């Protein structure tokens, strides 16, 4: 099934880029690293340890929404990396594309801190992790398009959790479209 976007969301260091690229490869889908769409001034700020404001994030979120909409219009499937820390950010990403889903890579502070301390070459300093956890608005009950993925496992397990979530989302969409809950494959 095509024309859909799966947004890998979560704080910095949760594994969005690594897991997103692996799941995209497994499912022969496009992969878009949201960090590549940040305006240069945003990267400069974060590199200096300065958290981004909502105003800073808006042009970036609009670029990501454009990328998602393009996938939808081209009838393609893609995995897009975006922290999506606040509901208002997720709402921007949902605009115009009916098949946007979020895979929330969720883990505890200590696990993610340890991972960030081991990685090299990323512009996001470890010092900003606390501000990311503070900014995170945990998904609400009305956000039915978000699947929580427990990242306190190895990479293969987290990748498989994401792959299974995508397959379940697709199956649910087929069942809803057919309106046939009695169909065996929809049970």
Swiss-Prot record:
Family: Belongs to the gluconokinase GntK/GntV family.
Gene Ontology molecular function, alphabetical: ATP binding; gluconokinase activity
Any one Pfam family match given in the protein's UniProt record, by short name: SKI
Catalytic activity: D-gluconate + ATP = 6-phospho-D-gluconate + ADP + H(+)
Pathway: Carbohydrate acid metabolism; L-idonate degradation
Keywords assigned: ATP-binding, Gluconate utilization, Kinase, Nucleotide-binding, Transferase
EC number: 2.7.1.12
GO biological process, one term: D-gluconate metabolic process
Protein name: Thermosensitive gluconokinase
Gene3D superfamilies in the record: P-loop containing nucleotide triphosphate hydrolases (3.40.50.300)
Binding-site residues for ATP, renumbered to this chain: 10-17
InterPro entries, alphabetized: P-loop_NTPase (IPR027417), Shikimate/glucono_kinase (IPR031322), Therm_gnt_kin (IPR006001)
The keyword Amino-acid biosynthesis belongs to this UniProt entry's keyword annotation: no
């Amino acid at each position: 099934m095509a024309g859909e976007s799966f947004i890998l969301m979560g704080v910095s260091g949760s594994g969005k880029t690594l897991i997103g690229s692996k799941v995209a490869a497994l499912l022969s889908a496009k992969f878009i690293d949201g960090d590549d769409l940040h305006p240069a001034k945003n990267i400069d700020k974060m590199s200096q340890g300065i958290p981004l404001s909502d105003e800073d994030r808006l042009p970036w979120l609009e670029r990501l929404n454009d990328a998602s909409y393009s996938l939808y219009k081209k009838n393609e499937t893609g995995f897009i990396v975006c922290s999506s820390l606040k509901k208002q950010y997720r709402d921007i990403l949902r605009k115009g594309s009916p098949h946007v889903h979020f895979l929330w890579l969720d883990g505890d502070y200590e696990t993610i801190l340890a991972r960030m301390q081991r990685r090299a070459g990323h512009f996001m300093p470890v010092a900003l992790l606390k501000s990311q956890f503070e900014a995170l608005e945990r998904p609400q009950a009305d956000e039915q398009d978000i699947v929580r993925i427990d990242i306190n496992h190895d990479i293969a397990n987290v990748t498989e959790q994401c792959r299974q979530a995508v397959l379940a989302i697709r199956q649910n969409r087929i069942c809803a479209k057919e309106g046939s809950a009695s169909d065996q494959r929809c049970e």
